[in-house]
Structures are given as structure tokens and as C-alpha cells.
From Swiss-Prot:
GO terms for biological process: lymphocyte differentiation; response to stilbenoid. Residues 1-20 form the signal peptide. This is Lymphocyte antigen 6D. InterPro entries: CD59_antigen_CS, LY6_UPA_recep-like, Ly6D, Snake_toxin-like_sf, Toxin/TOLIP. Keywords: Cell membrane, Disulfide bond, Glycoprotein, GPI-anchor, Lipoprotein, Membrane, Signal. It is found in: Cell membrane. Residues 99-128 form a propeptide. The lineage of its organism: Eukaryota, Metazoa, Chordata, Craniata, Vertebrata. May act as a specification marker at earliest stage specification of lymphocytes between B- and T-cell development. Marks the earliest stage of B-cell specification. It comes from Bos taurus. One of its GO terms (cellular component) is side of membrane. The gene is LY6D.
Length: 128
């Protein structure tokens, strides 16, 4: 038992003090990237995206003691609403989540698939 305890103490001493979380911290109309070391109490990197009717999108990134993500479905953020994204590893809030850029492509893919199925149905059963 003493050996295990000594091993754990030695391992803790060798590891040194824990590193503070690093997040991008900024406010911008685009995907800003400004790394900053967070305070020891911060456990999350938080990104808040607000959709403003007159000024467009506003992106705020910061360190946060707590974070509650919103449950908006992909591409479902309306004007005047905001989406909160949370993560907890170094510089994890660099990129905005893929739903923002992927939603138009996904919509186009669904439309293309629907058109292809419709054409296939017309060719398969021309008497309908």
C-alpha cells in the first residue's frame, strides 16, 4: 500500500501544476480567433452567436465558469435569437460549429435527392 501511495505522490509531483484552460476570447461579426489563458475557475470555452436583424451575426467567445448549450436544431436559429456552444478543451472554440456552413449544402443535397427520385419515378412509371 505504501508503494502505491508513494508512486501516486511521485506522479503528482512530476506532473506539476495543472495548466489553465485556453480559449479564444473576442467579440466580432465573424469567426474571431484570439487565444487567451483562462482563470483557474473557468472550466468551459463558450461561444454565443446572436442573429441580429439589422446588424447581422454577432459572435462572442470567452472563458466561462459554467456553460449551458442551447438546443437549436441545425440551421434553426431565427433572427433575434442566440445559440450558445460549450466545450472544455484548449482552444476548442476556434471554429464555429459545422451546422452554420453545412446547413445550405445539406438543404441543396436534400433538394437534389428529391428531384432525382421524382425523375426516376416518372421514368419508371410513365403512365401515372
Amino acid at each position: 500500500m505504501k508503494t502505491v501511495l508513494l508512486f501516486l505522490v511521485a506522479l503528482a509531483a512530476a506532473a506539476g501544476p495543472a495548466q489553465a484552460l485556453r480559449c479564444h476570447v473576442c467579440t466580432s461579426s465573424s469567426n474571431c480567433k484570439k487565444p487567451q489563458v483562462c482563470s483557474a475557475s473557468s472550466s468551459f470555452c463558450k461561444t454565443v452567436i446572436r442573429v441580429e436583424p439589422l446588424s447581422g451575426n454577432l459572435v462572442e467567445k470567452n472563458c466561462s465558469v459554467w456553460c449551458t448549450p442551447t438546443n437549436n436544431q441545425q440551421g434553426q436559429v431565427s433572427k433575434g435569437q442566440e445559440t450558445t456552444l460549450c466545450c472544455n478543451s484548449d482552444l476548442c472554440n476556434e471554429a464555429l460549429q459545422s451546422w452554420q456552413s453545412a446547413a445550405p449544402a445539406r438543404t441543396s443535397a436534400h433538394l437534389g435527392l428529391a428531384l432525382a427520385c421524382g425523375l426516376l419515378a416518372l421514368l419508371w412509371a410513365p403512365g401515372l
